[in-house]
């Protein structure tokens, strides 16, 4: 039986986790949620926790101090976050942080491959894990992979403030479906993509670029207002 497998940078806890669990449990099909547990440890062997919850399985693991410093605080927080929040003047990038970013995405993929089954549908959440599908596919994974941007997609001028922007765009093409919250965001992405690689529009809303075929979709994100107050 196929599952929905959600891979996210960091898992929530407490009330948020319970709420998310109820949402997953309401689905007819089982699921798997994989991500960083929020802990940072300085041990060579870092345990991977596997738990069964109502309606889905949960796989979590800690980061090393170096992973947290270079990936989370470095490339993501000091680099990608300012660009994706329209504050490029605050962005700081180094080759070492980018290397850690790619390496940690490979680690996410390594752990995911140990738990994925044929037919599982993989959904990856946001820009901390942009290259994750590439790491999965390069290990031979054949499962369908989707990626969702919950933030506005940056303009080409903003994106070019990232030294590795071309590599990041190329890594997105390993996804079978790329989701956005608005049509404007999708159009901005396609405009940025066409500036880097030739595009070919195929039947059934498929797109071909840099040797990959993928689709895009619009999935407006919202909240349950009753849970706010």
Label the model's feature ranges.
Residues 1-229:
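Catalytic cores of carbohydrate-active enzymes across secretory and cytosolic contexts
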